[in-house]
Amino acid sequence: MLRFLNQCSQGRGAWLLMAFTALALELTALWFQHVMLLKPCVLCIYERCALFGVLGAALIGAIAPKTPLRYVAMVIWLYSAFRGVQLTYEHTMLQLYPSPFATCDFMVRFPEWLPLDKWVPQVFVASGDCAERQWDFLGLEMPQWLLGIFIAYLIVAVLVMISQPFKAKKRDLFGR
């Protein structure tokens, strides 16, 4: 399995598949926000940023999957998935165990050199409450679904990182 994951990490297909899944999730988030009129909270926006990190890592990996640039993509992927797990876990706990003392910020805080909420307010401005339950599917709230998705991204990222020393076997069908 590790040899297979190493082989996949050196091809564009797996990286593009990951980019497609992250882009589909981002578009779904925008659908919820602009069509279903659900208000994203601060943690939702940070979770979006983590998902954009996974998307960016996938695009970097797809550019040059056989070069050391793929290792940069894997580190970004691992970090983004880990931060996504942290954020969605915190968000899930805020929704499952609401407390007047445990709240999220009122505004998204981006660095001054990267004010995404000013540049693209349709995507990065938060207007909802983190503890408010707005949507569920099969009994799970949106942060719980995202927690599962980020855990899956993280597990696969760890396995792909572990697989890097395992070189793919050369298949010689007609040799002895």
UniProtKB/Swiss-Prot annotation:
InterPro entries: DiS_bond_form_DsbB/BdbC, Disulphide_bond_form_DsbB, DsbB, DsbB-like_sf. One of its GO terms (cellular component) is plasma membrane. Residues 32-49, 90-144 are periplasmic. Keywords: Cell inner membrane, Cell membrane, Chaperone, Disulfide bond, Electron transport, Membrane, Oxidoreductase, Redox-active center, Transmembrane, Transmembrane helix, Transport. Residues 1-14, 66-71, 164-176 are cytoplasmic. Its main location: membrane. It holds the Pfam family DsbB. Gene3D superfamilies: DsbB-like. One of its GO terms (molecular function) is protein-disulfide reductase activity. Disulfide bonds join C41-C44, C104-C130. The keyword Methyltransferase does not apply. Belongs to the DsbB family. This is Disulfide bond formation protein B. It comes from Shigella sonnei (strain Ss046).
